[in-house]
Amino acid sequence: MRVYVVGGAVRDRLLGLPVQDHDWVVVGATPDEMLARGFRAVGKDFPVFLHPRTGEEYALARTERKSGRGYTGFTVHASPDVTLEEDLRRRDLTINAMAQDEDGTLIDPYGGRRDLENRVFRHVSEAFAEDPVRVLRVARFAARFEGFSVAGETLALMRTMVDDGEVDHLVAERVWQELARGLMETRPSRMFAVLRECCALARILPEVDRLFGVPQPPQHHPEVDTGIHVMAVVDHAAATAQPLAVRWACLLHDLGKADTPVHVLPHHYGHEAKSADRARAVSERLKAPLECRDLAVLLAREHGILHQARALRPVTIVKLLERTDALRRPERFGLLLEAAACDFHGRPGMAERPYVQAAIWQAALAAVRSVDAGAIARSCTDKASIPQRVHEARVAAVKARHAEEKD
């Protein structure tokens, strides 16, 4: 029985990155031997055990053979005669197909260290094509590891997988899981660039893919291309350490621009409502968490008016605060403003400029929240008029705040 640490832990150690988790492979052992040593069996599809002291996962060396479409169609073979090299061969990329023994000796049968030094993502074998999730994983790694590129032969294989319809068999939950993880990396735009390169973005997120090449008014968007703008917005959200809901909202906020008639371009009148509808549809199709869906819909619908804060009448400001439920959910409204700021900053030359609109909206919200709706309700004899009376008091409070600021 021989034990090796494999995969990401070895890769990250060679890159000088912190190692968060260890994955272990056990060669030459049976399930009964693992149980006899105090390990606890947890694997359903293949033999995986938890260490009795550390709780880390130890998997018996195994091979996998494709037996159906999608990422679940595999036949697994795990036995004491499976070698370490055979186990490593089933892995996706050479940089993830390295191992270290208990003495720290590197086992690298597929050139992973060389590819790390050259900053290349390269598939280990043609078995890469058997699991369509790997297309998303490679794209996600591109968002994490700065300066890496996809080997030409690997990109060609990914395109073939897309053409063969393998990506179409991915379930929504798995697509969301990989997209969400990629959005939380340091440069999410690289994930979408790789997905575009292999033509997978058009299958997974066609609504985003359609944004590339759609022009915007250059006086407001020097980058012109809507797709480029959206990528800059998402990257700014990552650079400012925004949570997933904000990053997802940033990705979807301009989807309606792809529907603008050609004769209207580069203007996009009323694109916010279309964007909101598409943001909801995409979020529901991929089964995104409700907080991600709802913030995406809000940003898509409201980002245009949020940017106009300095020119709005108090009544317009109050209406937005009411329809976004900002009074009951101020934390979510704060996230909405963070996302709007990312949209503002996602243009050339704007990254360092302050988004003053956020302070205007927060001040207005504070003024509206100072209104005692309960007192108004108690003093009102006509109960049907209570909502209107409260609304009018809120507008008056915002007017008063504006007057104070001018003074």
Curated annotation (Swiss-Prot):
CDD domains: HDc, NT_ClassII-CCAase. GO terms for biological process: RNA repair; tRNA 3'-terminal CCA addition. Its cofactor is Mg(2+); Ni(2+). Pfam families: HD, PolyA_pol, PolyA_pol_RNAbd. The keyword DNA-binding does not apply. Mg(2+) binds at D21, D23. Residues 226-327 form the HD domain. ATP binds at G8, R11, R91, R137, R140. Catalyzes the addition and repair of the essential 3'-terminal CCA sequence in tRNAs without using a nucleic acid template. Adds these three nucleotides in the order of C, C, and A to the tRNA nucleotide-73, using CTP and ATP as substrates and producing inorganic pyrophosphate. tRNA 3'-terminal CCA addition is required both for tRNA processing and repair. Also involved in tRNA surveillance by mediating tandem CCA addition to generate a CCACCA at the 3' terminus of unstable tRNAs. While stable tRNAs receive only 3'-terminal CCA, unstable tRNAs are marked with CCACCA and rapidly degraded. A single active site specifically recognizes both ATP and CTP and is responsible for their addition. Comprises two domains: an N-terminal domain containing the nucleotidyltransferase activity and a C-terminal HD domain associated with both phosphodiesterase and phosphatase activities. This is Multifunctional CCA protein. It comes from Aromatoleum aromaticum (strain DSM 19018 / LMG 30748 / EbN1) (Azoarcus sp. (strain EbN1)). The gene is cca.
